Amino acid sequence: MPPSIETYKQAFAATWRDDTPVDQVRFVVLDSETTGFSPVLDRILTIGAVAVVDGEIRLDDSFDELLKVTGDVGPVDVHGVTPDRSDRGYEEGEAVERFLAYLRDGVIVGHHIGHDVSMLDAALERMGTDVRLRNRTLDTADLTWHLAQDGAFAGVKLPHHLTLDTLADLFGVIPHDRHTASGDAFITALVFLRLLKLAARHNRTTLGVICQEFVIP
């Protein structure tokens, strides 16, 4: 097993407890651009992430890597990664190892984060390791719906399908570098900070409470 993956496993000797105050948690806001939506058939093109700690975005604690993809890179007009550019990226296994070394036991935050996690897990499987992402996850869409139930968005009718653009517009976040992994991670981090402030007003101040999944009735 690569040393970086063994180090990643050891990071979970003590995991974040449900009663951990939110301001004590290292959140890692993650986004990836991919060739498509199938973890089996498609591949990760770029991984972008930035940490949020104690209500602040830590630009000095960030990650941005390009991956080499053999074959079809998918919709270039969406993600902007051309085959020539992808050829200059890291091999998948090396990029994932580097990301795990950065991630450690951080709580993963993302918008519809299940896609990114499943793509990374598929990459780990192709590496021949039995390790999968062990980190707690927080989906900004789920947190938004919980806060809506709390009455945080009184007078605002939220669409059934919450996009990142919807939340950015709701909170007045200007979406720079949209559809790049690092750009979308930063936009999501800004949205997440707004959500954390609303959560605090509604007594959602511990990790277990804000990480709850939401099932739309």
Which sequence ranges carry the predicted segments?
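Short alpha-helix plus adjacent loop in nuclease-associated cores
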Residues: 137-157
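Acidic, divalent-metal-coordinating active-site segment for phosphoryl/phosphodiester hydrolysis
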Residues: 180-191
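Conserved non-catalytic scaffold segment of RNase H-like nuclease domains
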Residues: 3-127, 131-134, 149, 161-175, ...
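Generic recognition of well-ordered alpha-helical segments
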Residues: 143-146, 167, 191
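Acidic two-metal-ion nuclease catalytic site recognized across multiple nuclease folds
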Residues: 1-18, 170, 189-217
